[in-house]
Amino acid sequence: MGEFSRLTGVFFEPGKTFADIAERPRWLVPLLLVIVAGVAFYFLYGQHVGWERFLRHQMETNPRVQQQMERIPAAQRDAAIAMQTKFMGIGYYFGTIVMVPLMYVISAAIVLGIASGMMSAGVKFKQVFAIVCYAGLPGILKHALAIVVMFLKSPDEFNLVNPLAFNPAAFMDPINTPKFLYTVAMSLDLFTIWVILLTAVGLKAAAGKRLSFGGALFAVVLPWAVLVLLGATIAGIFS
């Protein structure tokens, strides 16, 4: 399969495509595309909405932070916001360029440990890493849709943390809903589920008869569920 056929096949023929990816595990092109899409989205967000608006919104929706900021004199508060604004965009760019590949590596290693270590699937790290990179391609579509929504909405109404209404959290009050519940609901995102299913399809294709689709899905969902619950617990503690 050529690279273009792989990129389109992930969406239209995932089983056949991931079988080819497992046989010849290349990962650079999908990883670069995911990174470029993320950087483009955050660049346009910084230009159209602005990081100061995002920072103020985050403070307004977190009662604990809001109480802390109210104790600070207005001049010092504005200076602190201005300082944080300078580094906010850099942080998101860093997260996209550095942390996304790192998280892919960690995810691949964990899935490999479960699939091969616990289930004797016999897959290799290079295969799983390539599968994770290609399975992340729906993120490009998510960023593209988010850009469209961003320019259709007023900058004050656009929510960077949850830009699309493809999860239950989009229909919840972010201020009054318990942060644990809100974080879990936000994690149940259509694109996240899509990525999970693609990863499981890829893992099954790489393992062949040594692993069922249910087993592959378990190997992917287990670490994701643990991470979601951990993140939701932390969000609940610090809300």
Task: Set out the residue ranges of the language-model regions.
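Alpha-helical transmembrane segments of multi-pass membrane proteins
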Residues: A37-V49
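Membrane-interface interhelical loops and short interface/amphipathic helices
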Residues: H48-F87, I175
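Hydrophobic transmembrane alpha-helix segments characteristic of membrane transport
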Residues: V105-Q127
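Membrane-interface helix starts
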Residues: G15-L32
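Hydrophobic residues within alpha-helical transmembrane segments
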Residues: L32, F94, V98, L102, ...
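Short, membrane-interfacial amphipathic segments enriched in basic
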Residues: M1-F12, A80-Q84
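Hydrophobic alpha-helical transmembrane segments and adjacent short intramembrane/lumenal linkers
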Residues: Q127-S239
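Individual transmembrane alpha-helix segments
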Residues: R77-M103, L181-I193, V201
